[in-house]
């Protein structure tokens, strides 16, 4: 481990809290900031310092950012009260973990470069439960030296980190990842509803699927939601819609047809129109069941989510 560097953390939502908590518990010198200070306060019990204003983080050598949208990223970095508003900015590296567009990431890189700060794009695969299970993974792009400097701290949070090259390549990987997330979830919902309408209990069908060559960490992880209809939010339909839109935008930019992504986006929009954004995107299965003329009921069967040996979105 190199000489410890002071770490700043911006954004204490579901993901940000779990990630910052792992950093603090690993002994990193972490100062956290969140728009609602009360959400960050519990991290003090794990050794983190809680900043009163964003500019306080400008004294940190490395600053992580984990917020919801590109608008939020711009505000916390370059807004009137953002990180760069401090009189003395000592930050040398920003590690930006949010899901944002290629264009937004490139713009952020230029804003930071003008202030002598490097950007490491480092979006993630996983959710808060996956983070707590120690199964998160990073995909990173930017200067190789920045990745090498960040790696010890990334590994405090997650066991896996992949470096894919310079610039904004990690954003493209994350966009592709989340397009796959949406398409796979919709496909899994369709075949599970088909099996049930033919008479196969959902838990039995998914038990087979999870043990087959088609099973995956992700299908196991979503099995409890599909079987017992527990849609406590891990990732909202609106956030998935945002990522599908990013994917479709990228498809247009690079002239790659994405018909399955486009159809999944339309289905997701229909789900959102029914006012389900306070629940998990796995509710796609209920939406599809209604289209098939059946009403799902919880099966109340104990099923494993696979987190003891894996994780998922």
Where do the protein language model's features map onto the residues?
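NAD(P)+-binding Rossmann beta1-loop-alpha1 motif at the extreme N-terminus of oxidoreductases
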Residues: 1-65, 92, 162, 296
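Hydrophobic beta-strand scaffold residues
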Residues: 30, 50, 119-120, 161, ...
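Rossmann-fold NAD(P) dinucleotide-binding segment
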Residues: 54-118
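Rossmann-fold dinucleotide-binding core
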Residues: 99-182
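Helical "substrate-binding/catalytic lid" subdomain
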Residues: 149, 168-292
């Amino acid at each position: 481990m190199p000489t410890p560097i002071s770490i700043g953390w911006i954004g204490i939502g579901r993901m940000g809290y779990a990630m910052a908590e792992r950093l603090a518990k690993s002994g990193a010198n972490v100062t956290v900031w969140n728009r609602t200070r009360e959400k960050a306060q519990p991290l003090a019990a794990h050794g983190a310092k809680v900043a009163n204003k964003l500019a306080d983080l400008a004294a940190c050598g490395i600053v992580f950012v984990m917020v919801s949208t590109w608008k939020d990223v711009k505000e916390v970095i370059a807004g009137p009260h953002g990180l760069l508003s401090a009189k003395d900015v000592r930050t040398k590296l920003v590690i930006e973990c949010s899901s944002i567009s290629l264009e937004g990431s490139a713009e952020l890189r230029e804003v930071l470069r003008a202030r002598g700060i490097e950007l490491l794009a480092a979006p993630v695969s996983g959710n808060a439960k996956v983070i707590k299970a120690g199964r998160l993974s990073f995909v990173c792009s930017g200067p190789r030296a920045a990745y090498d400097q960040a790696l010890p701290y990334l590994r405090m949070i997650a066991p896996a980190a992949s470096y894919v090259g310079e610039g904004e390549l990690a954003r493209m990987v994350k966009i592709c990842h989340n397009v796959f997330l949406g398409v796979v979830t919709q496909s899994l919902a369709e075949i599970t509803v088909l099996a049930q309408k033919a008479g196969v209990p959902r838990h039995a069908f998914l038990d087979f699927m999870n043990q087959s060559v088609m099973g995956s960490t992700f299908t196991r992880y979503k099995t409890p939601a599909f079987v017992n209809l527990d849609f406590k939010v891990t990732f909202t339909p609106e956030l998935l819609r945002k990522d599908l839109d990013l994917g479709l935008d990228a498809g247009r930019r690079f002239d790659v047809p994405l018909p399955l992504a486009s159809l999944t986006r339309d289905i997701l929009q229909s789900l959102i129109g029914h006012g389900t954004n306070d629940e998990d995107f796995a509710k796609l299965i209920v939406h599809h069941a209604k289209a098939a003329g059946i009403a799902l009921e919880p099966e109340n069967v104990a099923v494993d989510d696979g987190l003891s040996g894996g994780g998922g979105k």
